[in-house]
């Protein structure tokens, strides 16, 4: 059943107007949610994703810290080493780094990982868009499966030794595979946003998440009207769709569609990112959407319970590209700002943008 959310939140009205004429307008006094602390201090540039393992450890997809610089004997002869490739960095609950996955990378095993997830047994799933592959590791870092998957951009572990991916060039939003690399099913109708097939695939990119029952949630990154779909992962049936289409959001949607229409005239297109991050509580089915630095909290009946503008511990405006929902708090992450802890509930502080 499709739901059209009736939102009358001042923060949303301000956001939609600001996208059209941001230099001319200042945000109103919106409720503010400030970070309580920064975690995993050196994580920042190159960050991709963070997950919590069943053992309580954190798995962070990001470049490891560079090795100590060797003494430079000659300025002319010195070379700047290339930045390290992203890996899965594992931290304990206190933030102490424990190990990396893979510990020793084989040629072609991991090229440019784009996403990761963990299943209930602790296996680590890594999607590598550049290498057109998915790798699966044990919690200790042993490779147990590696197979070709076309341009995977998102990955979610599912029950029954299956996993779901989003691919950059697929004709369906979601594909489900088993651990032998066999494609089991594809589902999710793409939105028709452009006559250019390549651009239309790009505009149908999204964020993928799952709840404890294995239902899949797809949040469109670029669809002008913020939209989240819920699918049954076993059948591919569409169970629910939340679309924010009120008058408050029309200026934002109109601006996004105007940018997409530029492609028809042959001009370079820079699509507006509408939903920058999506996070799901797998136990309660509550979820959070980030529209710019506006964080919106929904209950499991798609009702808005809170909306706040978010800031780091140094009062820096934050636009998250990852949301990890935990029992007592949220971890919001941004490349290059890093990973910050936030309360799940709203704050009473107000700050002008």
Residue ranges and their predicted role:
Residues 1-2, 237:
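Short amphipathic alpha-helical segments with coiled-coil-like heptad repeat character
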Residues 2, 22-24:
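A composition/secondary-structure signal for short, hydrophobic, low-basic-content segments
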Residues 2-11:
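Bacterial N-terminal signal peptides that target proteins for export
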């Amino acid at each position: 059943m499709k739901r059209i959310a009736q939102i009358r939140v001042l923060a949303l009205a301000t956001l939609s107007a600001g996208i059209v004429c941001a230099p001319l307008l200042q945000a109103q006094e919106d409720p503010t949610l400030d970070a309580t602390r920064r975690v995993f201090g050196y994580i920042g540039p190159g960050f991709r994703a963070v997950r919590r393992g069943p053992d309580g450890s954190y798995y962070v997809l990001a470049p490891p810290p560079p090795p100590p610089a060797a003494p430079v004997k000659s300025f002319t002869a010195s070379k700047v080493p290339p930045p390290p490739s992203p890996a899965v960095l594992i931290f304990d609950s206190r933030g102490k780094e424990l190990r990396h996955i893979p510990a020793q990378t084989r040629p072609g095993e991991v090229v440019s990982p784009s996403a990761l997830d963990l299943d209930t047994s602790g296996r680590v799933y890594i999607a590598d868009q550049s290498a057109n592959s998915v790798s699966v590791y044990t919690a200790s870092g042993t490779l147990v499966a590696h197979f070709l998957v076309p341009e995977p951009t998102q990955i979610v572990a599912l029950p029954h030794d299956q996993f779901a991916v989003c691919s950059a060039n697929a004709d369906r939003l979601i594909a489900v595979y088993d651990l032998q690399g066999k494609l089991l099913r594809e589902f999710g109708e793409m939105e028709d946003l452009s006559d250019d097939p390549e651009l239309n695939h790009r505009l149908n990119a999204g964020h993928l998440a799952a709840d404890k029952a294995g239902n899949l949630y797809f949040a469109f990154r670029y669809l002008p009207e913020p939209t989240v779909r819920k699918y049954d992962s076993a059948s591919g049936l569409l169970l629910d769709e939340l679309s924010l289409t009120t008058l408050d959001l029309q200026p934002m949607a109109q601006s996004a569609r105007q940018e997409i229409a530029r492609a028809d005239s042959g001009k370079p297109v820079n699509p507006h990112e509408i939903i920058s991050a999506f996070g799901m509580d797998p136990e309660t089915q509550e979820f959070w959407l980030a529209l710019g630095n506006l964080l919106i909290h929904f209950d499991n009946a798609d009702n808005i319970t809170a909306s706040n503008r978010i800031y780091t511990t140094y009062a820096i405006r934050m636009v998250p590209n990852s949301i990890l929902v935990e029992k007592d708090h949220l971890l919001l992450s941004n490349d290059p700002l890093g990973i910050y802890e936030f309360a799940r509930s709203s704050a009473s502080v107000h700050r002008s943008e």
